[in-house]
Amino acid sequence: MNNKINNIKITQVKSAIGRKYDQRLTLVGLGLNKINKSVILENTNSIKGMVEKVKHLLKIENM
């Protein structure tokens, strides 16, 4: 079996200023708080849902 875990690299490209409170909390939950900060996370359903909520503020790359 292939036990390889898919990861995604998420980079914040737009500011959270002026966004809804829940979108700002979602960015914090993803580990993002500054423009151009990147994190590498496992590609799980919960992470996909969080990314979908704020995808207009992010750049997403598969790894």
UniProtKB/Swiss-Prot annotation:
Disulfide bonds: none annotated. The keyword DNA-binding does not apply. GO terms for cellular component: cytosolic large ribosomal subunit. CDD domains: Ribosomal_L30. GO terms for biological process: translation. GO terms for molecular function: structural constituent of ribosome. Part of the 50S ribosomal subunit. This is Large ribosomal subunit protein uL30.
